[in-house]
């Protein structure tokens, strides 16, 4: 429906900002397997081809879990602007995941704005991030 977050909304938001982006799909209403889209996105962010990444899924959980299987990825499931702010400020999230079925277009706009305008704080948060990879 028109009141939920969609990839069209995100593409439009990025275009209004004048930012280049790479669209990994999906571009249809057909049911798809989220790992088929999560892995290429994660690889692009890990390699530096894209930064940051944005993913939208029904609840956001499945694609978020898949993205976070990649060592260099810190995907954050954000359903409001405050969560998006903290994901960037404290966790240096490099992929924003939004639960498309559960947020409105207005909420998505606020989340995107907050995620892209917040800088990583570093300091004690960097020490914690350094402990994330399994060694």
Show the residue positions of the predicted features.
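A general structural signal for well-ordered alpha-helical segments in protein cores
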Residues: 7, 38, 63-64, 84, ...
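Short helix-loop-beta junction
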Residues: 12-20
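Charged helix-capping and loop-helix junction motifs
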Residues: 35-39, 79-80
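Short, small-residue-biased leader/transition segments that mark boundaries at the very start
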Residues: 1-6
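Mid-chain, well-packed structural core segment of small domains
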Residues: 55-101
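A short beta-strand-loop structural module common to alpha/beta enzyme folds
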Residues: 19-31
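Short, structured active-site "lid" loops
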Residues: 37-59
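Short, glycine-/small-residue-rich phosphate/pyrophosphate-handling segment
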Residues: 81-127
């Amino acid at each position: 429906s028109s009141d939920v977050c969609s990839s069209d909304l995100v593409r439009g938001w990025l275009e209004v900002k004048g930012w280049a982006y790479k669209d990994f799909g999906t571009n249809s209403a057909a049911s798809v397997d989220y790992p088929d889209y999560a892995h290429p996105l994660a690889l692009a962010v890990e390699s530096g081809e894209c930064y940051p990444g944005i993913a939208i899924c029904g609840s956001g959980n499945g694609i978020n879990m898949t993205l976070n299987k990649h060592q260099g990825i810190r995907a954050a499931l954000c359903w409001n602007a405050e969560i998006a702010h903290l994901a960037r400020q404290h966790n240096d999230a490099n992929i924003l995941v939004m639960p498309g079925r559960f947020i409105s277009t207005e909420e998505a706009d606020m989340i995107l704005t907050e995620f892209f305008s917040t800088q990583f704080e570093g300091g004690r948060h960097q020490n914690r991030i350094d402990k994330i990879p399994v060694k």
